[in-house]
């Protein structure tokens, strides 16, 4: 049980993890907690001769606290400290491979969920983070003091590139700031990516010329391999598009970090979709909470990320959602267990990420969205724009009217 060290004082440079652990019946919590620390750091199933060739005391993970979960039988929050030297600098991939790579299939555990990570400045400073961040994005768009407005083009699959471009134009011309490729729009037989990019670029420039505003469409660069992804991002930049998009969980953290570096070097904003997150994050006792995936994304890089709505068709509890929204946007976030924040997180100077609210929302939700998420957010109305009873153009006019009214009423204290 050398990995269970309740007397250990955590260092400022340690990465700290909070796991929700359900041991198998008959397995003591201390033993299971030590197993989590061992398996996610230097341990293996037996003592090996080569242990003597290194300093395990320097490199091992330590389970330093175990607390029972109130109201749950045989469930514990286990705190583990990992020395900084266990992780490659600037690699979210390596961090997750170490911390959650193997331990979740461990026999001694019935279930295990990573609830939160504390990323020390000594580690976060090795990452570029978001390509631009909230303030630079607003400066690029010249839009301040209100949420930015988006719309996912529907039907998500089946439109030709020309008709897709027409829908983009109608939405942007009416008053939206952004339109969006759906996460599964890549390059299918009915609409190849290059055709889509060209027709969308035409819609962008036409709507910009007519409205005098800067417009964007999240061109999904996600592809089957990294070289193809980069080719699409480069083509988007050559067309003069201001923003591209990536599905960061299906595409992978390595691909995402490569794209984020390209975006910063070339002045592109990066919109991130979290497709597949619920596979990992939805179960309450096993997997990984979305706040951990959100922290990973902020380090890997993205200017927008879908973060739940609190009011639409997709699940999201208010306090917990606001907890990880703050972890995305703010510099310094205090520990607050009511909001699911297990550790105080200091991002130092890393740029923030704008949370995107999308999924079953429409203009009637705007006052609630403005109140809950504030100005630094992007509500996205796909069906709420394209499903307007009078047509797409009136739908896209309704959204800016709703947001301006909501912001004005809030600012006047009504």
Curated annotation (Swiss-Prot):
Catalytic activity, reaction form: 2 (2R)-3-phosphoglycerate + 2 H(+) = D-ribulose 1,5-bisphosphate + CO2 + H2O; D-ribulose 1,5-bisphosphate + O2 = 2-phosphoglycolate + (2R)-3-phosphoglycerate + 2 H(+)
UniProt binding sites for substrate: 102, 152, 156, 274, 306, 358
Textual note on the cofactor: Binds 1 Mg(2+) ion per subunit.
Modified residues (N6-carboxylysine): 180
Top-level taxon: Eukaryota
EC number: 4.1.1.39
Keyword Lyase: yes
Annotated site location: Transition state stabilizer: 313
Post-translational modification note: The disulfide bond which can form in the large chain dimeric partners within the hexadecamer appears to be associated with oxidative stress and protein turnover.
Record GO biological process: photorespiration; reductive pentose-phosphate cycle
Family, per entry: Belongs to the RuBisCO large chain family. Type I subfamily.
Complex formation: Heterohexadecamer of 8 large chains and 8 small chains; disulfide-linked. The disulfide link is formed within the large subunit homodimers.
PANTHER family (UniProt xref): RIBULOSE BISPHOSPHATE CARBOXYLASE (PTHR42704), RIBULOSE BISPHOSPHATE CARBOXYLASE LARGE CHAIN (PTHR42704:SF17)
Role according to the record: RuBisCO catalyzes two reactions: the carboxylation of D-ribulose 1,5-bisphosphate, the primary event in carbon dioxide fixation, as well as the oxidative fragmentation of the pentose substrate in the photorespiration process. Both reactions occur simultaneously and in competition at the same active site.
Protein name: Ribulose bisphosphate carboxylase large chain
Organism: Antrophyum reticulatum
Annotated gene: rbcL
């Amino acid at each position: 049980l050398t990995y269970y060290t309740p007397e250990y004082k955590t260092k400022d440079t340690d990465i700290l993890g909070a796991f929700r652990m359900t041991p198998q019946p008959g397995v003591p919590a201390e033993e299971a907690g030590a197993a989590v620390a061992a398996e996610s750091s230097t341990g293996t199933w037996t003592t090996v001769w080569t242990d003597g060739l290194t300093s395990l005391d320097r490199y091992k993970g330590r389970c330093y606290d175990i607390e029972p979960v109130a109201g749950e039988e045989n469930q514990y929050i286990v705190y583990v400290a990992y020395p900084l030297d266990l992780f490659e600098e600037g690699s979210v991939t390596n961090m997750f491979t170490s911390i959650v790579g193997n331990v979740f299939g461990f026999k001694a555990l019935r279930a295990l969920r990573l609830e939160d990570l504390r990323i020390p400045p000594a580690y976060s400073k090795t990452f570029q983070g978001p390509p631009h961040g909230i303030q630079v994005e607003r400066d690029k768009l010249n839009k301040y003091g209100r949420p930015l407005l988006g719309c996912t083009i529907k039907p998500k699959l089946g439109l030709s590139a020309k008709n897709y471009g027409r829908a983009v134009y109608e939405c942007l011309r009416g008053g939206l700031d952004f339109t969006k490729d759906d996460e599964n729009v890549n390059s299918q037989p009915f609409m190849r990516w290059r055709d889509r990019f060209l027709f969308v670029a035409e819609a962008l420039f036409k709507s910009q010329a007519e409205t005098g505003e800067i417009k964007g469409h999240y061109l999904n660069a996600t592809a089957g391999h990294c070289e193809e992804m980069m080719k699409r991002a480069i083509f988007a930049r050559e067309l003069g598009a201001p923003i591209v998009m990536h599905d960061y969980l299906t595409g992978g953290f390595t691909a995402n970090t490569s794209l984020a570096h390209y975006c910063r070097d070339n002045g592109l904003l990066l919109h991130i979709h979290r497709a597949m997150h619920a596979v990992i994050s939805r179960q309450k006792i096993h997997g990984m909470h979305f706040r951990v995936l959100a922290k990973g994304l902020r380090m890997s890089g993205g200017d927008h990320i879908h973060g739940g709505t609190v009011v639409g068709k997709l699940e999201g509890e208010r306090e917990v959602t606001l907890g990880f929204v703050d972890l995305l946007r703010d510099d310094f976030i205090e520990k607050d267990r009511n909001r699911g924040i297990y550790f105080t997180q200091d991002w130092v100077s890393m740029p923030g990420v704008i949370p995107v609210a999308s999924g079953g929302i429409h203009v009637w939700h705007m006052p609630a969205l403005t109140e809950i998420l504030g100005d630094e957010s992007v509500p996205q109305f796909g069906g709420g724009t394209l499903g307007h009873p009078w047509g797409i153009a009136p739908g896209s006019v309704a959204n800016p009217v709703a947001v301006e009214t909501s912001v004005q009423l809030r600012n006047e204290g009504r």
